[in-house]
Regions:
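Thiamine diphosphate
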Residues: 1-204, 211-213
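Glycine-rich nucleotide phosphate-binding loop and flanking beta-alpha elements
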Residues: 30, 241, 264
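Short, well-ordered secondary-structure micro-motifs
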Residues: 204-207, 245
């Protein structure tokens, strides 16, 4: 999630496309670490800010303005998704291309407003959906209603929804770059769904030449080519990649089975 926010912050500062980026969030902006955008970009309000927020003295205060760029919809996933669809179809409805990024708790996307996801496909919406806190590994304190591990099964039923489940920040950067090219340069009528999680773990450098495999959906993270004997392949994505890497150590040290670990997207 942190890697996504950094990528988004870079995109909104780009002189060519920054003004076309539409960050959309229901009520979870602080969970995702997006509160810095409140002051930087402002939250869109047709009437401006008519009150003084409680955090007015804070560095990342809640700031609404008529020219704000962030759409903060509150606890209204259907409304936020509808705003994403409106921005994602502006290229055809208004002949003005916008690039919407809608991030939300991933359990409250396809499972809650799946009909809108289908409608987005029918309308040839272009944009990015980010299922935050995915993987069933964090946010237990807020209950099982946030524990998403199956939204990709639902996303796979929509033909023009391209979904990825990355584990590392460099994968996310490659996927978003490819999505921008796919939708806004090649002008394909698709949208991207990407799950991101909020666990804190080491972010390695990208293996040389991994970009093509990341885009296609699978690439090799590590391989014990020099070993002999029984060999297996471990395939994993998202939050489970680190578990697969840990399993590889156990297999090699205790059972003497070597494996090339492959990262699924």
């Amino acid at each position: 999630t942190m890697a996504f926010v950094r990528i988004l912050a870079t995109l909104v500062r780009d002189k060519n496309i920054g003004s076309r980026i539409v960050p959309i969030v229901p009520d979870e902006a602080r969970t995702f670490g997006m509160e810095g955008m409140f002051r930087q970009l402002g939250i869109y309000s047709s009437v401006g800010q008519l009150y003084q927020p409680e955090d007015a003295d804070a560095l990342a205060a809640y700031r609404e303005s008529k020219d704000g760029q962030v759409i903060e919809a509150g606890i209204n996933e259907a409304g936020a998704f509808a705003a994403w669809m409106a921005a994602g179809t502006s290229y055809s409805n208004h002949l003005h291309t916008l690039i919407p990024f809608y991030i939300y708790y991933s359990m409250f996307g396809f499972q809650r407003v799946g009909d809108l996801a289908w409608a987005a496909g029918d309308l040839q919406t272009r944009g990015f959906l980010l299922g935050g806190t995915a993987g069933r590994t964090t946010l237990n304190g807020e209950g099982l209603q946030h524990q998403d591990g199956h939204s990709h099964a639902l996303a796979a039923t929509i033909p023009n929804c391209i979904s990825y489940d990355p584990a590392y920040g460099y994968e996310l950067a490659v996927i978003i770059q490819r999505g921008l090219e796919h939708m806004f340069v090649e002008k394909e009528p698709v949208y991207y769904y990407i799950t991101v999680m909020n666990e804190a773990y080491e972010q390695p450098a990208m293996p040389v030449g991994a970009e093509q495999g990341i885009v296609k959906g699978m690439y090799c993270i590590q391989s014990d080519e020099g070993t002999t004997g029984a060999r297996i392949r471990l395939l994993a994505s998202g939050t489970l990649l680190r578990e697969a890497l840990a399993a590889a150590v156990i297999l090699l040290s205790l059972i003497h089975i070597s494996e090339p670990t492959r990262q699924l997207q």
